[in-house]
Amino acid sequence: MFKALIGAAVVVLLAVLSKTRNYYIAGLVPLFPTFALIAHYIVGKGRSLDDLKTTIVFGMWSIIPYFVYLAALYLLVERFRLETSLALAALAWLVAASVLVGLWVRLHA
């Protein structure tokens, strides 16, 4: 229930920010590391320090799929409807994330 309330609060915050003079800040709010904090706490409490550091480094590399998503969306919004652009950009993220995981597994196995 608490997570749902936080999620709802974030949605309201995004809606409010999108109507302000500084609407672009709405793009920063989803990047608050809520899930990263949870993941790092769980890994940090349940695994070794080396495992935590590996998780942190992988998190650094995970910025690449997000960049691919943003770049794709930037290019697509002028060519397609917003919904189509969002779906295609999400697909681009999925492909980039799959490549990242595949390379990570291959290089760190």
Curated annotation (Swiss-Prot):
Entry GO terms, CC: plasma membrane
Protein origin, superkingdom: Bacteria
Protein location: Cell inner membrane
Alphabetized Pfam families for the sequence: GlpM
InterPro entries: GlpM/YdgC
Biological process, per Gene Ontology: alginic acid biosynthetic process
Effect of inactivating the gene: Mutants are pleiotropically defective in alginate biosynthesis from various carbon sources.
Membrane topology, as annotated: Multi-pass membrane protein
Protein name, entry field: Membrane protein GlpM
Natural source organism: Pseudomonas aeruginosa (strain ATCC 15692 / DSM 22644 / CIP 104116 / JCM 14847 / LMG 12228 / 1C / PRS 101 / PAO1)
Name of the gene: glpM
